[in-house]
Curated annotation (Swiss-Prot):
It comes from Homo sapiens (Human). One of its GO terms (cellular component) is cytosol. It comes from the Eukaryota. The keyword Transport applies. Keywords: Lipid transport, Lipid-binding, Transport. GO terms for biological process: cholesterol import. This is StAR-related lipid transfer protein 5. Residues 1-213 form the START domain.
């Protein structure tokens, strides 16, 4: 992928993510519990929903980021039940790459294994926040593979945010914005994401404790 185009695209995605983070209008809460709130609103990118999760994770910002960051051989594959593989298709800079993520079957196998090819940008902000910003791209080195339905991530990612005065806690805001593709009943998709995101936070908390205590 052309590096200049990749840089331009990824910065636009990061800006869109900041807009999602700042925009408080139009979100409808669909699941709450154990300190985690999941809400949604209709996507303007595809005929589906944009989901937003927020919760406090007990761990320093760097510990939490270490568990969620997009990295080959990283911890995410070890604890996230919705990730079975992560590989770098093209490394563009030390903070920008094209990746392929594979996911298992889900919802009692109503959702078959998926894979996603994304342009991913990691950004650090002056207040200490670290963000991961991603969107789907096509790449000649990663055509569709047998055994996987190719899904499409629209602008999505997460913000690991420091909590002033509480260095051992991190506010994690996540945005899931996924077209799972294939012929899935909408009610299956609508029930999958809120439940899956709630488990994501619970499993992440266990991972931070397991890998960083």
């Amino acid at each position: 992928m052309d590096p200049a185009l990749a840089a331009q695209m990824s910065e636009a995605v990061a800006e869109k993510m900041l807009q999602y983070r700042r925009d408080t209008a139009g979100w409808k809460i669909c699941r709450e519990g154990n300190g985690v709130s999941v809400s949604w609103r209709p996507s303007v990118e595809f005929p589906g929903n944009l989901y937003r999760g927020e919760g406090i994770v007990y761990g320093t910002l760097e510990e939490v980021w270490d568990c969620v960051k997009p990295a080959v051989g990283g911890l995410r594959v070890k604890w996230d039940e919705n990730v079975t593989g992560f590989e770098i298709i093209q490394s563009i800079t030390d903070t920008l790459c094209v990746s392929r993520t594979s996911t298992p079957s889900a919802a009692m196998k109503l959702i078959s294994p998926r894979d996603f090819v994304d342009l991913v940008l990691v950004k650090r902000y002056e207040d200490g926040t670290i963000s991961s910003n991603a969107t789907h791209v096509e790449h000649p080195l990663c055509p569709p593979k047998p055994g996987f339905v190719r899904g499409f991530n629209h602008p999505c990612g997460c913000f690991c945010e420091p909590l002033p005065g509480e260095p051992t806690k991190t506010n994690l805001v996540t945005f899931f914005h996924t077209d799972l593709s294939g012929y899935l009943p909408q009610n299956v998709v609508d029930s999958f994401f809120p439940r899956s995101m709630t488990r994501f936070y619970a499993n992440l908390q266990k991972a931070v404790k397991q890998f960083h205590e």
